[in-house]
Curated annotation (Swiss-Prot):
It comes from Yarrowia lipolytica (strain CLIB 122 / E 150) (Yeast). This is Vacuolar protein sorting-associated protein 27. Belongs to the VPS27 family. Component of the ESCRT-0 complex composed of HSE1 and VPS27. SMART domains: FYVE (SM00064), UIM (SM00726), VHS (SM00288). InterPro entries: ENTH_VHS, HGS/VPS27, UIM_dom, VHS_dom, Vps27_GAT-like, Znf_FYVE, Znf_FYVE-rel, Znf_FYVE_PHD.
């Protein structure tokens, strides 16, 4: 795991070391020393540690302030010179001066601040980078702030207690400080955490812990430091600069507890493999060179299509659509010339990765790498091919969108038609099984409603009756075929009825004459069902008069005589 992913939070550590739950006047010495190791090994930036301590000093709880002052004093004595520079800055000293000037502050906290400022001023005496603490003490004394009397213990405090060893600052150079090999993008530089020198991968590939720097995890060291540390010597070897090499001022070193990072080696291997593939890769022949193969494939496809059509014609199953489908199914789909090969995709991805890595390199590094320029030229030649591929993809996308819209419309129309058919079938099913009621077709003039017939249909093999009614003297005509109708019970003779005028003569059976006689309507039956004529009602009698006795039944005849009124 890399060092930046395992960095502990300094704020959490400081907050835990200065917790309100700690008894007054006591501190967790083990946790304080652990924080000192984090600062001294540069695992956490010194400025972040200083700001975290300052936030705890500004807390309103006096116990938290006293614990923060105690932790600050321990870190000053064990944190290293880079941490002392941050402590001696105005950002940290000004809050301490504000507490010393405030008469309303907690007396114990104020007295402790004055005591520590006086001790630190004595310890930092004679160092320009730490002069701000001494100036603060002088200014407070000039303002009339009384400091506690210095004891003999404070007089014994010298600058030796701040000489705690810390990882050295890194030295920058253009060549390896051991082999003299110049650095490049492929031959990267590596710093030794013990001496701060810069070396190549071959000269700085050992890992070991550095307890004298507070580094308890394996870190990268050069070969010389590794041998000395194995022998029990913590002093860094002296590396003489290579003649002709240019060195710069020491650079700010990153945290020293970085674990082995194999990403650089993997990138170098990937670059070498990609370049080897690029050298051995042969571009495909141009499209003109493959035209013959395409012609052969097309001829074979056409011949196969013709054979299929001939076979279908012989079997009687040929059709235009079938022939089109057969020819389409036998067509060989040639690979698109605009598709990128695996090597081309690998080169594009590798160039993108290298460009991202070059952002953290010094200016001009890319100009000193001819292989990267060669890779860039190779990828640049793919731009027209990528443009054509993108154009074809966009066209295909548009056509697919159009087809999708058409298909959606067709499906919607089909669903509507299917729903209509289903509704129609459901309606027919609901009305099915019930035969339509027969209707009676009749013609009448001046007939009362109660004389309307209730029989409809056509009687096959049954007698047929026909009636006619005119405005003149009505008469009844009837012809009975087969079975005599129910009107055949009337006596044979001439019956004369008139709507106006004198009443007709009484029948020979006797009885009062009928006053009003309705003319028989004209009926026309078609498809009437069979009925039992024996139970059929007799013809209605004239209103107002007694009903005449029925005549004896007449024998069945082949044809009934015509009755005239």
């Amino acid at each position: 795991m890399s060092w930046w992913s395992s960095t502990p939070s300094i704020d959490e550590q400081v907050e835990k070391a200065t917790s309100e739950s700690l008894p007054s006047g006591e501190s967790d010495l083990a946790l304080n020393l652990e924080i000192c190791d984090l600062i001294r090994s540069k695992t956490v930036p010194a400025k972040d540690a200083m700001r975290s301590l300052k936030r705890r000093l500004l807390n309103r709880n006096p116990n938290v302030q006293l614990a923060a002052l105690q932790l600050t004093d321990v870190c000053i004595k064990n944190g290293g010179s880079h941490f002392l520079v941050e402590i001696a800055s105005r950002e940290f000293v000004d809050p301490l001066m504000a507490i010393a000037r405030n008469d309303d502050a907690n007396p114990e906290v104020r007295q402790r601040v004055l005591q520590l400022l006086q001790q630190w001023a004595v310890a930092f005496a004679g160092q320009l980078q730490l002069q701000q603490v001494e100036n603060a003490v002088t200014q407070l004394k000039s303002e009339g702030v009384s400091f506690p009397s210095a004891s003999h213990d404070n007089a014994a405090v010298t600058s030796t207690f701040i000489d705690t060893k810390a990882p050295p600052e890194w030295i920058d150079s253009d060549v390896c400080m051991e082999s003299g090999v110049a650095f490049s993008f492929l031959n990267r530089k590596h710093h030794c955490r013990n001496c701060g020198g810069v070396f190549t991968q071959a000269c700085c590939q050992n890992y070991i812990t550095l307890p004298h720097f507070g580094i308890n995890v394996p870190v990268r060291v050069c070969n010389g430091c590794f041998k000395n540390l194995k022998k029990g010597k913590s002093d860094a070897p002296i590396h003489k600069p290579v003649p002709g090499a240019t060195t710069t001022a020491p650079s700010s070193a990153p945290p020293a507890n970085s674990a082995p990072n194999d990403d650089e080696d993997d990138i170098q291997k990937a670059i070498r493999l990609s370049l080897q593939e690029q050298e051995s890769y042969k571009p495909p022949p141009p499209a003109a060179a493959t035209s013959n193969d395409d012609d052969e494939d097309m001829k074979a496809a056409i011949a196969a299509s013709l054979r299929d059509m001939e076979n279908e014609r012989q079997t009687g199953q040929t059709s235009a659509s079938a022939g089109g489908l057969s020819s389409a199914s036998t067509t060989v789909m040639a690979p698109s010339l605009t598709d990128l090969t695996a090597t081309e995709e690998s080169n594009i991805n590798l160039l993108s990765l290298l460009v991202e890595r070059l952002k953290g390199e010094p200016q001009g590094t890319i100009l000193r790498e001819p292989k990267i320029q060669e890779l860039y030229d190779t990828v640049g030649n793919l731009r027209p091919k990528l443009a054509r591929t993108m154009g074809e993809t966009i066209s295909k996308y548009d056509s697919l969108v159009d087809m999708h819209a058409k298909m959606t419309t067709v499906i919607r129309y089909y669903d509507a038609l299917l729903e209509e058919k289903l509704n129609q079938a459901y309606t027919n099913r609901q009305s099915g099984g019930y035969a339509p009621q027969p209707h009676l077709s009749h013609q009448m003039t001046g007939q009362p409603p109660h004389l309307a017939p209730h029989l409809t249909g056509q009687i096959t093999g049954q007698p047929h009756m026909g009636y006619q009614h005119t405005g003149q003297a009505p008469y009844l005509t009837g012809q009975v075929t087969g079975q005599a109708p129910y009107l055949s019970n009337q006596p044979t003779g001439h019956l004369t009825n008139h709507y106006t005028g004198s009443a007709p003569s009484a029948p020979q059976y006797g009885g009062p004459p009928a006053q009003n006689v309705y003319n028989a309507p004209s009926y026309q039956y078609s498809g009437a069902p069979e009925y039992d004529y024996a139970s059929s009602p007799s013809a209605p009698s004239a209103p107002g008069g007694p009903s005449a006795p029925s005549a004896p039944a007449q024998p069945k005849e082949e044809s009934a005589p015509l009755i005239e009124l």
